[in-house]
Amino acid sequence: MAVIKCKPTSPGRRHVVKVVNSDLHKGKPFAGLLAKKSKSGGRNNTGRITVRHVGGGHKQHYRLIDFKRDKDGIPAKIERLEYDPNRTAHIALVLYADGERRYILAAKGMQAGDKIQSGVEAEIKTGNAMPLRNIPVGSVVHAVEMKPGKGAQIARSAGAYVQVVARDGAYATLRLRSGEMRKVPVDCRATFGEVGNAEHMLRQLGKAGAKRWRGIRPTVRGVAMNPVDHPHGGGEGRTSGGRHPVTPWGVPTKGYKTRSNKRTDKYIVRRRNK
């Protein structure tokens, strides 16, 4: 994988930094694992904007990813690595011995031709998935479930990983990249290794249009709006906003705590690093 800085042949190319991976499949994705993906423009069923800065972008198909890794005891071979427009990580097309194909997240170091497996009898090897009760303490894993059988929810983006730091009874303790320590049931599954494409963070789009290709619209400052649109809006000439920073709905920002799910507080051993 190479990080390439483009020549400044135009203002739009001057600041572009690309991450090029020659191992990725250059053809079409596997048609049997594609789903339609409709654009909402950030609107809900009533037509109102519920997510700001969303709209436009290139047409995409959703890739059906196997986050459960529940095909136990059947060896599989990685056919190829692919680009996925729906996530920062790359994905791998896996062919099982019984003929079924599935997409999984591509782990760091994973290559076409590698053998992987799921289940308690799988060996400790990058790309293999098993319950946390069978994973040695100190191991680095990704694609971790929070509820058994629900599918991976933790450490799914490019370069992400968590470390298993303890196991006590029905729960395993994980250290997340943010510094948070969290308890997860030992029957939850995880995959060995870290997610690939860690160089994604070095990418620079270089121009506003590249954001628009991805369906991301501009973010307008509140002080540049009218009073009807934002608490910071209005005033003659340039202003500072006239109050402590708030969201468009008046909720304080800049460090204001908004977490209210007390039901799951008992699973957080240590809060993330501020």
UniProtKB/Swiss-Prot annotation:
Statement: the UniProt record of this protein carries the keyword RNA-binding: yes
InterPro entries for the chain: NA-bd_OB-fold, Rib_uL2_dom2, Ribosomal_uL2, Ribosomal_uL2_bac/org-type, Ribosomal_uL2_C, Ribosomal_uL2_CS, Ribosomal_uL2_dom3, Ribosomal_uL2_RNA-bd_dom
SMART domains: Ribosomal_L2, Ribosomal_L2_C
Gene Ontology biological-process annotations: cytoplasmic translation
Family, as annotated: Belongs to the universal ribosomal protein uL2 family.
Subunit structure: Part of the 50S ribosomal subunit. Forms a bridge to the 30S subunit in the 70S ribosome.
Protein name: Large ribosomal subunit protein uL2
Organism of derivation: Shewanella oneidensis (strain ATCC 700550 / JCM 31522 / CIP 106686 / LMG 19005 / NCIMB 14063 / MR-1)
Gene giving rise to this polypeptide: rplB
